[in-house]
Amino acid sequence: MAYAALASARLGHRSAAIFGADKIAAGAAEIDLLRSAGVEVHIVPLEQGPIFENVEKDHGRVQTCIEPGEPVPVVDVPNVWRAAPAWLVVPVSNETGPEWAAAIPPDARLVLGWQGLLRKLVAGTETGRKAPTRGPLVDRADLIGVSRGDLGKGTGLDELNKLLRPGTRLVLTDGIHGGLAFEATTRGPANEVTYDSIPSRQVDSTGAGDVFLAALVAAWLDRGAPTEEPGPTSADLRWAAAAGALAVEGVGLPGVPDRAAVIARLADIDHEGQKRHGSDCSRSEDRPDRH
């Protein structure tokens, strides 16, 4: 949740965050960083929060569950928070139970990061993977984000579509291969939009998916898109991909980019594309005509 909340704030949106935290986590420097960025923080006291150990290896990240933590109960929040146009639910250890689906105001967009509901967690063992299933949060969600790496091999769009209520949009990310978005319908996936990845120099991938999702919501809100729109658009996805690419180039929460950084990265990419196009045209014009 911390990455999504900070990304929302740094991308220019008023942001509030509800955290379940034990005494140690509640006093962490990351909480101060959120507050300094303008995020309004509500900490729900827990006896034990989740703890993971991440180790990057040649074949990818290996994550070990040190402590799975405990559920975060639904809490009362200020009325101004309840008026927010979008709520991001991004659990890390299945800590947001089904009761959270009913707690989100009915006229707000519910955006779900599916990853945290798909982890099989046993203290002292490597994090496992659960098959995606339906549930109150999935049924309530207007937009769901998930990585191919969080799904079993061979999980196809038709299979995912069957788990979603008609009208829900799902974004399926695939790292350097880009990704796609589609709208769930009774006839199968519809309104599919693909996007390319943004080149990056990866240092730390922690939280990149949450930053991507928060940036996607920010783009959606910036143009006043209605909830019934079969988005997100290719421009929304490109913006989110740039934010996610920047996030992996830093270390930890301080690496979350701001709006200016995303704009600059996209401008650099456009400039490089124009240079390549111009070079290709020049080479074409230099070739002698052959008759």
Annotated model-derived regions:
Residues 52-53, 119-125, 202-207:
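Short, charged, surface-exposed secondary-structure boundary motifs
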Residues 1-10:
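Histidine-anchored nucleotide/phosphate-binding helix
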Residues 86-161, 176-178, 184-185:
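Conserved beta-alpha-beta core of the PfkB/ribokinase-like small-molecule kinase fold
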Residues 6, 52-55, 178-182:
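Short beta-strand scaffold segments in enzyme catalytic cores
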Residues 23, 120-128, 225-229:
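Short, flexible/disordered intra-domain loops and linkers
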Residues 10-95, 100-112, 265-281, 287-291:
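Conserved N-terminal subdomain of the carbohydrate kinase-like
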Residues 77, 134, 202:
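Acidic, amphipathic alpha-helical patches
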Residues 157-291:
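Conserved phosphate-binding/catalytic region of the ribokinase-like
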